[in-house]
């Protein structure tokens, strides 16, 4: 008998459109597998209302919210639409950014007692916050580019002291980032103190916590991992960016890969670099208690060859140009089998958790 799978996408997020593209790729894989009854659920970008769709398309069909059935969640009873219990067996969330990768949806599904593809609450929440994630990774002796972080309140209290720290601790140029946002949105490179204030103000539009890092000339290496306690680390790939300062949002989604953006899979690395990248990816995945999947991004400094972990994505992109699935495919795991494996990991993780908590006996 087929399992009932809910594919959740969209979301109140700056990465809404990317989520829709990722969902379409996964939807096609699920159709090809023919193992699941698929319930696509679209989260409206403005209202956050959940709607049940018949299918997923790319480009998305116009959404008529006046006629689409709304999805409601009743803890202890199930997920309903049109007064019918959908009897969902597993959920595959592909909501990028806020509410999707920060532990929010994962928390809701844990309350609902439904298996969920990907990381749990803690791993999602920590990984999504670049500042707290870096603090934790630093405690595990994982190399990071020098950084500082601060809250909006601290900045308005003493912005001159923070600008002084940027100059003395990091030195220019630096990268200014909102702590919680993906797809390189809201990120700028400041080459002098004259630029830093405007870039901090821009980043504060997206989040209340800011991370500032030393800017280095580096290769951008990515590494895919899947699994729970036992994990598989795939051969890393490299994103070669030729017409951009770094792999920002425009480079990722506004440019057709070609002369400007080149994907090298596998990446051309020295043996010691390859082993170090896989080791750091393993340590991050393990110590942040991740499960299901992640894409771990690294910098390799061009002059010295020094490796730095950049960030971790617990719901990586699944679009046709996304590196996560491409790296898996390069090592022999085809897209539909990747999707199937991720669903299996969700069931395994759920069973392991239920073994530890049983209030009925």
Curated annotation (Swiss-Prot):
Binding site for ATP: 167-222
Domain ATP-grasp: 134-344
Matching InterPro entries: ATP-grasp, ATP_grasp_subdomain_1, D-Ala_lig_Van_CS, D_ala_D_ala, Dala_Dala_lig_C, Dala_Dala_lig_N, PreATP-grasp_dom_sf
Gene of this entry: ddl
Residues noted as binding Mg(2+) 2 in the record, renumbered to the chain: 311, 313
Full protein name: D-alanine--D-alanine ligase
Organism: Borreliella burgdorferi (strain ZS7) (Borrelia burgdorferi)
Molecular function in Gene Ontology: ATP binding; D-alanine-D-alanine ligase activity; metal ion binding
Cell compartment(s), UniProt: Cytoplasm
Cofactor comment: Binds 2 magnesium or manganese ions per subunit.
KW Nucleotide-binding (keyword) present: yes
Disulfide bonds: none
Family the UniProt entry places it in: Belongs to the D-alanine--D-alanine ligase family.
Principal location listed in the UniProt entry: cytoplasm
Functional summary from the UniProt entry: Cell wall formation.
Record-listed Mg(2+) 1 binding positions: 297, 311
Keywords annotated in UniProt: ATP-binding, Cell shape, Cell wall biogenesis/degradation, Cytoplasm, Ligase, Magnesium, Manganese, Metal-binding, Nucleotide-binding, Peptidoglycan synthesis
